Structures are given as structure tokens and as C-alpha cells.
Amino acid sequence: MKPSGLTFAFLVVFMMAIMYNSVQVTADADADAEAEALANALAEAGILDWGKKVMDWIKDKMGK
């Protein structure tokens, strides 16, 4: 029994969907790791606290 062209096309699309999904999951995990590393670096450098102080100073100067 010879598979039809439609069966072959379905298998190709199915394999492409599986490959795309696996690449997307890896990209999301990498992005999450990068975001966490950036947040940790900013927290360790004290930049977040500095930014809060600047915003408080601006609010005081604007009278809000």
C-alpha cells in the first residue's frame, strides 16, 4: 500500500509543528533566564533602589 501525497504533506506539516514548538520552548526558557539574570544584576548593583530614590525626588520636586 503506497501512502498518498496528502498523507506525506500532513506528516511534513506535523513534523514542522513539533520542531517549531520545541524551538519556541527553548527560546522562552532562555528569555526567562536572561530576564532573571538582569533583575539579579540590577538588584545587586543597587540600581533599582537608586531609581526609586530618583522617582521619589522627582515626585517631591513636582509636589505630588
Curated annotation (Swiss-Prot):
Q: Does the keyword Secreted apply?
A: yes
Q: How is it modified after translation?
A: Truncated sequences of this peptide have also been found in the venom. It is possible they have been cleaved in the venom.
Superkingdom, according to UniProt? Eukaryota
Q: Which residues form the propeptide?
A: 28-45
Which coarse location class describes where this protein primarily resides?
A: secreted
Q: Does the keyword Protein transport apply?
A: no
Tissue specificity is: Expressed by the venom gland.
Q: Where in the cell is it found?
A: Secreted
In the UniProt record, the signal sequence range is 1-27
Per the UniProt entry, what are the Gene Ontology biological process annotations, in alphabetical order? defense response to bacterium
Q: Which UniProt keywords apply?
A: Amidation, Antibiotic, Antimicrobial, Secreted, Signal
Where Methionine amide occurs, the residues are 62
Q: Which GO terms describe its cellular component?
A: extracellular region
Identify its protein family: Belongs to the formicidae venom precursor-01 superfamily.
Q: What does this protein do?
A: Antimicrobial peptide with activities against E.coli (MIC=1.3 uM), S.aureus (MIC=3.1 uM), and S.cerevisiae (MIC=50 uM). Also shows histamine-releasing activity (32.9% at 10 uM). Does not show hemolytic activity, even at 50 uM. It is a short peptide for which no alpha-helical region has been predicted.
Q: From the Swiss-Prot or TrEMBL record, give the protein name.
A: U-poneritoxin(01)-Om1a
Q: What is the organism of origin for this protein?
A: Odontomachus monticola
